[in-house]
Each structure stands twice: as structure tokens, then as C-alpha cells.
């Protein structure tokens, strides 16, 4: 029996979204239970681009996640607060989001959320931090049929339009996903070194994809965000029909309790995951693996910490 890891969903109604998507993201960021992690994420984002030039322009207040080596202790003592040297090469940077909006992203994640909604949360979180720090954000999004791009901008209004593209373009009626098509566009259009954030689901590592990851990680700071697939063998009774969004193959309910199916699925899943992990680790790519909304901030924090440490 061959068990794949294609995108799985269940037949449940999806309510349309009204209002600002960015406002929803910010509301999640500043919930009392997540505020500390959000401030840490903000600090690590601020540090990720920072170099070590010989001169510094001015001082600013310390943010959790800043490097201790950047603290100006004398100035801090005079000001009665912890101050950080702002190095001369701290300038406006660019963050390019490469987001899969194909049919696969309209499926459910490991935690039950729609993958496209997690993609909105990830892009909105990092995009909001970037705009807060005066950086520019851009978007390359699409599927196997169409790839669209939004130019670099540094406003919340522009970020809101990007989030709306991600949300509205991904549905069960969309063409199938093609991360390779998005990465081809990125390689053709990104001329200057940028922070590139790829948001996709768990895809198989082809020779083409491997070559793209090697090329992009050599030219850019690369962060790979993997939205975790639902486990078709773990779907419970009463959730509705379980089917593969690519081929619309429906899983018979009797197979969900098949021990052989579970074992083969777990083996193939582990093999795919290990191949991808080895490549990304070898190329120095930071990885965030997110299965639900609540995982977004801690996993992004972990990825930016790894990115920051890798540059030292």
C-alpha cells in the first residue's frame, strides 16, 4: 500500500473573513499570554540584519533579543536605562514573502486550522515587525497556474493587501500548488540580498526544489516556514469526509484504524522530513514548522534565533 502525504481536508463549511486581516494578526500577537514571546520575537527580528561595522550612528533602548555585546554600559549608566549601539550599517532592509496559495493551502493543518490562515498569521506577524522597523515587505504568491508579485513597500496598508491576496487566492477551487514555480520567480526577480521567507506546506524534495534552495540560500537570508499537514490516519469520526485536495480521493473510514496504513504513513513521513531537514540544515536555512496558530510566534522566534546565531 502506498501512502502519500498530500494535502488533506474535511468537508466542513468555511466562513468568509471580514475586516482587517492585519488587525487580527496584531490582536493575536498582543494577547496577554503571548506578549513576552512577541517582544522577544521583535528583538530577534531587529538583530537579524545587524552587522558589526566599526562606527555606530546613535543609541536606542534595549529590546529583549538584542545582543549583549551591543550594550553601551557607560551610556546606560548615565541614562538609567539599558541602551544599545545602533550600528552604522543598520539601514532599511527588504523582506520577501514567498507564499503558496494553491489548493493544498486550503486544506487543514495538523492542528485543524486551515493552512492558508496559518500562512496569513506567519506573513502578518513577520511583515508587521518588518514595517515597524522601517523595512520593506514584498510578496510572491501563487500556484501551478498563476504567480503574482507585489512590489516592496513599507506600509501597513500594503501589508494588508498582501495578506488579503494570500487569504482570497487559496481555495479548494484553486489550481494545485507549485512551490517550485514561486521559487523560480524569486530567483529571476530578486536582484539584491534580502530576507526571504518561504511559506508552504510539507512538500516532497525534488531535484528541482533542491537546486532552488541551494541557489536562494547562497544569495539571500532564507527562512523556511513549513505548515504541517493533517494526519489522515488520525482524523476522527464525525469530522466529515476526509479527502485529498489534489486528486479528491476520499479515504474510506475503515482505513483510519488500519495499523499497517498508520505504520507506512509514519515511515514515509519520517523519510521525507529527514531528507528536507538535512538539506536545510546543510544550507544554513532556518526552519519553522507550524501546525496551528498558537505555534506561530514560538516557532518563528526559534527560527530567528537560529538565523541570528548562524551569522555570528
Model-derived features with residue positions:
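Exposed, interaction-prone extracellular/peripheral surfaces
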Residues: 2-51, 56, 60-69, 75, ...
Amino acid at each position: 500500500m502506498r501512502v502519500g502525504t498530500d494535502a488533506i481536508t474535511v468537508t466542513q463549511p468555511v466562513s468568509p473573513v471580514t475586516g482587517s486581516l492585519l488587525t487580527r494578526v496584531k490582536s493575536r500577537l498582543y494577547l496577554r499570554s503571548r506578549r513576552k514571546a512577541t517582544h522577544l520575537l521583535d528583538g530577534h527580528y531587529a538583530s537579524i540584519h545587524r552587522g558589526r561595522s566599526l562606527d555606530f550612528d546613535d543609541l536606542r533602548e534595549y529590546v529583549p533579543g538584542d545582543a549583549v555585546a551591543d550594550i553601551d554600559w557607560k551610556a546606560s549608566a548615565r541614562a538609567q536605562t539599558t541602551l544599545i549601539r545602533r550600528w552604522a550599517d543598520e539601514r532599511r532592509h527588504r523582506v520577501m514573502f514567498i507564499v503558496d496559495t494553491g489548493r493544498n493551502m486550503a486544506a487543514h493543518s495538523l492542528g485543524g486550522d486551515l493552512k492558508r490562515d496559518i500562512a496569513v498569521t506567519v506573513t502578518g506577524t513577520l511583515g508587521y515587525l518588518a514595517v515597524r522597523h522601517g523595512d520593506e515587505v514584498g510578496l510572491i504568491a501563487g500556484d501551478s497556474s498563476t504567480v503574482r508579485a507585489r512590489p516592496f513597500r513599507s506600509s501597513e496598508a500594503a501589508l494588508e493587501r498582501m495578506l488579503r491576496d494570500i487569504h482570497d487566492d487559496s481555495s479548494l477551487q484553486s489550481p494545485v500548488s507549485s512551490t517550485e514555480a514561486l521559487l523560480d520567480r524569486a530567483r529571476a526577480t530578486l536582484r539584491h540580498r534580502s530576507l526571504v521567507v518561504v511559506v508552504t506546506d510539507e512538500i516532497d524534495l525534488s531535484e528541482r526544489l533542491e537546486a532552488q534552495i541551494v541557489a536562494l540560500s547562497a544569495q539571500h537570508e532564507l527562512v523556511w516556514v513549513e505548515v504541517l499537514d493533517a494526519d489522515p490516519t488520525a482524523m476522527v469520526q464525525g469530522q466529515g469526509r476526509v479527502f485529498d485536495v489534489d486528486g479528491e480521493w476520499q479515504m474510506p473510514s475503515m482505513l483510519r484504524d488500519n495499523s499497517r496504513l498508520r505504520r507506512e504513513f509514519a515511515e514515509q513521513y519520517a523519510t521525507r522530513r529527514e531528507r528536507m531537514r538535512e538539506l536545510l540544515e546543510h544550507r544554513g536555512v532556518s526552519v519553522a514548522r507550524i501546525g496551528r496558530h498558537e505555534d506561530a510566534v514560538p516557532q518563528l522566534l526559534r527560527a530567528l534565533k537560529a538565523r541570528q546565531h548562524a551569522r555570528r
